[in-house]
């Protein structure tokens, strides 16, 4: 997979994108992004449905959601997991960091 993005031209309104992509290794991807100037929005977090997720904002203002599929979870197990406090806390953390970031807007990049 390849994703091509480019900066806004002179005089253009800011046009940041919100990208959600699956990667082989969330932690390695996040490390590479921060080494290139990205700011972490959401630390790597395992979620009940079997994905590890993280978010970062790149120097051009684009918000990246990176997912790594860790395991397949059957519906019965998923229901059980969502009853666990750790799963609820993880979802609240992931949702909260997004809400906080979106409240910052592009100027907060």
What does each model-identified segment do?
Residues 1-57, 67-109:
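Vicinal oxygen chelate
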């Amino acid at each position: 997979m390849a994703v091509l993005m480019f900066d806004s031209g002179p005089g253009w309104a800011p046009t940041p994108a919100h990208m959600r992509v699956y990667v082989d290794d969330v932690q390695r991807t996040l490390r590479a992004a921060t080494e290139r100037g990205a700011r972490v929005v959401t630390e790597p977090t395992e979620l009940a449905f079997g994905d590890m997720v993280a978010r970062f904002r790149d120097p051009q203002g684009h918000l990246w959601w990176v997912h790594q599929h860790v395991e397949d979870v059957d519906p019965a197990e998923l229901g059980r997991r969502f009853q666990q406090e750790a799963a609820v806390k993880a979802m609240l953390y992931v949702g909260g960091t997004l809400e906080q970031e979106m409240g910052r807007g592009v100027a907060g990049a």
